[in-house]
């Protein structure tokens, strides 16, 4: 086992289950209110879960961060997207300048936007962008691995460190997010491997692909799996071979949240795939995750059903984390 994997294993040993006794106390608090018992349904359950996560029966996660993992994906060369890779860094810069939809809704939900450049083609310019580049873009998975195993582990560790930094800065709740042209392709590739499905069964239109573009996307994923032969039982192998740096970074965020005992919200398809991969590395990390909705992408429903998560706030296909911001407002 390489040194970085040993380091990752040691960090994951810090993850412990959430506090059930605190959750019982939180339920008593809720049941003592003048309202129908369990009247808020899944939202009430999630708030009690947050109590157990934070070890506080009356939690107030007032300082919140939306962490956007930005990275470019070489599979764009296969014509699987509507835009080129330059858009990834453009959007990260816009986030730094508070000019994106995500920024507007984050502010409305009382969240600070934290754009992280973990694998863009260039360094971020705006001072709000946290440049933690593991490598400048990934390989074209249709022809080669996305990255080396070592780079994958380094990206996961980077995600963990970002969350630890935010904890030290006083943040109490994390929302996951990503920005990476081509990442619905890499996420669908991971899902196809993990669930043993034909790519056609797990691949959607992403940001509005035409039928021709969708076929290119499916074929690119089939090629990626055939060329790289990822091991479905090895999360790191799957990410390194057919995933992306944004996915690896988000995996680290989920693990980091569990290590730091912080609630972390899952938003959208790519976030859900990353959450699933994180739980392959440490199953207890799931206790710190809160699903906010079920994406319209085909594989998202598979993940939610596999985990028996029924808290589907909405079935949507809105981009830049709008759904999770609505959840935080509630």
Question: Which residues does each predicted region cover?
Answer:
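N-terminal loops that bind phosphate or other acidic moieties
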Residues: 2-330
């Amino acid at each position: 086992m390489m040194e970085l994997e040993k380091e990752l294993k040691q960090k994951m040993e810090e993850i412990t289950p959430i506090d059930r006794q605190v959750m019982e106390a939180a339920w008593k608090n809720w049941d003592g209110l003048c309202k129908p018992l369990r009247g808020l349904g899944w939202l009430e359950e999630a708030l009690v879960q947050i109590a157990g996560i934070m070890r506080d029966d009356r939690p107030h996660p007032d300082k919140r961060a939306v962490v956007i993992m930005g990275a470019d994906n070489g599979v764009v060369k296969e014509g699987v997207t509507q835009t080129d890779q330059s858009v990834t860094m453009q959007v990260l810069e816009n986030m730094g300048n508070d000019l994106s939809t995500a920024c507007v809704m984050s502010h409305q939900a009382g969240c600070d936007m934290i754009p992280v450049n973990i694998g863009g083609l260039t360094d971020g310019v705006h001072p709000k962008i946290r440049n933690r580049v593991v490598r400048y873009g990934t390989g074209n998975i249709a022809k080669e691995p996305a990255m080396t195993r070592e780079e994958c582990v380094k990206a996961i560790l980077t995600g963990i460190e970002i969350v630890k930094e935010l904890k030290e800065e006083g943040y109490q709740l994390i929302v996951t997010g990503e920005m990476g042209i081509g990442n619905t392709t890499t996420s669908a590739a991971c899902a196809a491997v993990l669930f043993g499905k034909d790519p056609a069964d797990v691949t959607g239109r992403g940001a509005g692909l035409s039928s021709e573009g969708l076929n290119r996307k499916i074929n690119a994923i089939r090629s990626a799996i055939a060329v790289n032969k990822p091991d479905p039982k090895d999360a790191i192998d799957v990410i390194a071979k057919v995933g992306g740096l944004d996915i690896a970074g988000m995996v680290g965020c989920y693990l980091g949240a569990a290590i730091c005992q912080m609630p972390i919200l899952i938003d959208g398809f790519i976030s859900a795939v990353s959450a699933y991969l994180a739980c392959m590395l440490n199953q207890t990390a799931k206790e710190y995750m809160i699903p906010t909705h079920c994406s319209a992408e085909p594989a998202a429903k598979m993940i939610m059903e596999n985990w028996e998560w029924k808290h589907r706030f909405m079935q949507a296909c809105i981009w830049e984390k709008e759904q999770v911001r609505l959840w935080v407002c509630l």
